[in-house]
């Protein structure tokens, strides 16, 4: 049917740009939430003395960040980023942003009022608000575009199904209809000041820690600090690190500024370098940085370097090479007999040690190994100059392991050669 309609046009070629952007095939999915449920949710939020908002990836998918920011600002709600999100779903240097849910204990020490209402907006995956809500008898408002996720992992007081942008806008209008600007100001003034003071101190402390970090191996905090200092204001960061809060804590993201892509909501590995090529293809006039862990890069990603080199894809690839799978190490060392015995036979990635700069050189991509804090800023600057010349660049950043079991180098010794009965 669609092809027949194109043939009927006098100038079918005029539709081709629209087809390329899929506008001609776009079906509106903007489902408006139930107004009765909106009113119930608005009352819960308005009556709360210490609310909390958790934000997830559906906010970015629905282009709803400005509306969600307006909602949070209206009631001075502290905002925590869901740990499994593809983007940064709320400006992470905003005065109301307190980090991830794991930062909540430090926030509550600063503002010692028990959370009495939660709104989880645009979230689907586990390991979020449902963990926080365990054993708490407080109202939970869950807003999502997916009806199968609402109330699935935690009982909800209000379920809001619909487009996230419309949900946020309707909540704002409902709250404004229930309270005057003066009333809202009186209810939120103290909390707004407390949250902004906490957030400012947290960001200042994080940046200062990054600035002052030094040594060999390279502290990852220093790397991210210098990257934040040197990147373009509208750069795109495609990140595939074990812990996304590193990136969100140290690099400034916002709808009008830098864009964060990754990690996937399923926490998959092996996609980031190829995704950075696609990102540069889609956004050729924006600086693109691919942030990788050594473990993730070893999930078969070197072939993307071939594409970068052949087609002159100017992407700066930075591999945080600490010779370890940190995610598995944290889990193993955090619980169980192996952790109690200080043994981890899974996570160590040395022997042989990987040299990713040499690997890049096989594809005619320039690069370097950075192991000391004094080397990192000049290396990033060289990388960005190479990007301006139209070529990719590789930085193999030899970063320090940290946390429990950081110094472990155990692995199970095994040799296929020793299995042979004859030397063939």
Q: Model segments located where?
A:
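Glycine-rich, acidic loop regions that bind phosphate or pyrophosphate groups
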Residues: 1-7, 43, 84-193, 380-384
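N-terminal beta-alpha lobe that positions the nucleotide/phosphoryl donor
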Residues: 1-43
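Glycine-rich phosphate/diphosphate-binding loops that line cofactor/substrate pockets in enzymes
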Residues: 7-12, 37-51, 71, 112-114, ...
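Short Gly/Thr/Asp-enriched flexible loops that form oxyanion-binding sites at enzyme active sites
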Residues: 22-33, 65-68, 130-132, 249, ...
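Conformationally flexible catalytic loops at phosphate/diphosphate-handling active centers
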Residues: 34-47, 204, 210, 419-420
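Glycine-rich, anion-gripping cofactor-binding loops and their flanking helix/strand elements
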Residues: 57-141, 254-286, 300-303, 334, ...
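Thiamine diphosphate
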Residues: 103, 112-114, 151-153, 159-161, ...
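Active-site diphosphate/adenylate-binding microenvironment
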Residues: 193-280
């Amino acid at each position: 049917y669609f092809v027949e309609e194109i043939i009927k046009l006098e100038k079918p070629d005029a539709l081709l740009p629209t087809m390329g952007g899929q506008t001609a095939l776009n079906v509106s999915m903007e489902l408006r939430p139930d107004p009765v449920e909106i009113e119930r949710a608005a009352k819960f939020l308005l009556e709360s003395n210490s609310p909390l908002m958790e934000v997830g990836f559906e906010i970015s998918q629905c282009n709803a960040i400005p509306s969600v920011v307006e909602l949070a600002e209206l009631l001075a709600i502290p905002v925590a980023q869901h740990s499994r999100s593809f983007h940064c779903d709320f400006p992470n240097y905003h005065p109301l942003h307190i980090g991830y849910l794991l930062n909540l204990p430090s926030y509550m020490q600063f503002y010692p009022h028990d959370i009495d209402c939660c709104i989880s907006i645009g979230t689907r995956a586990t390991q979020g608000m449902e963990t926080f809500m365990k054993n708490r008898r407080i109202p939970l408002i869950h807003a999502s575009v997916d009806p199968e996720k609402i109330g699935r992992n935690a009982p909800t007081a209000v379920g809001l199904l619909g487009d996230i942008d419309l949900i946020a806008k309707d909540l704002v209008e409902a709250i404004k209809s229930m309270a005057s600007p003066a009333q809202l100001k009186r209810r939120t003034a103290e909390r707004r000041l407390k949250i902004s003071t906490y957030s400012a101190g947290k960001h200042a402390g994080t940046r200062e820690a990054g600035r002052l970090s030094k040594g060999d191996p390279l502290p990852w905090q220093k790397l991210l600090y210098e990257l934040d200092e040197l990147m373009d204001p509208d750069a795109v960061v495609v990140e595939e690190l074990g812990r996304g809060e590193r990136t969100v804590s140290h690099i400034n993201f916002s709808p009008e500024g830098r864009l964060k892509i990754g990690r996937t909501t399923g926490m998959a590995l092996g996609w980031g370098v190829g995704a950075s090529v696609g990102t540069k293809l889609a956004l050729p006039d924006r600086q693109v940085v691919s942030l990788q862990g050594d473990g993730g890069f070893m999930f078969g990603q070197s072939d993307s370097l071939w594409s970068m080199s052949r087609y002159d894809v100017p992407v700066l690839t930075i591999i945080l090479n600490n010779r370890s799978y940190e995610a598995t190490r944290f889990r193993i060392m955090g619980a169980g007999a192996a952790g109690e015995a200080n043994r981890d036979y899974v996570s160590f990635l040395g022997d042989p040690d990987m040299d990713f700069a040499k690997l890049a050189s096989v594809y005619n991509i320039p690069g370097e190994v950075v192991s000391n804090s004094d080397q990192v800023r000049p290396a990033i600057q060289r990388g960005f100059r190479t990007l301006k010349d139209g070529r990719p660049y590789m930085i193999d950043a030899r970063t320090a392991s940290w946390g429990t079991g950081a110094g472990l180098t155990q692995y199970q010794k095994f040799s296929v050669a020793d299995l042979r009965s004859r030397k063939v």
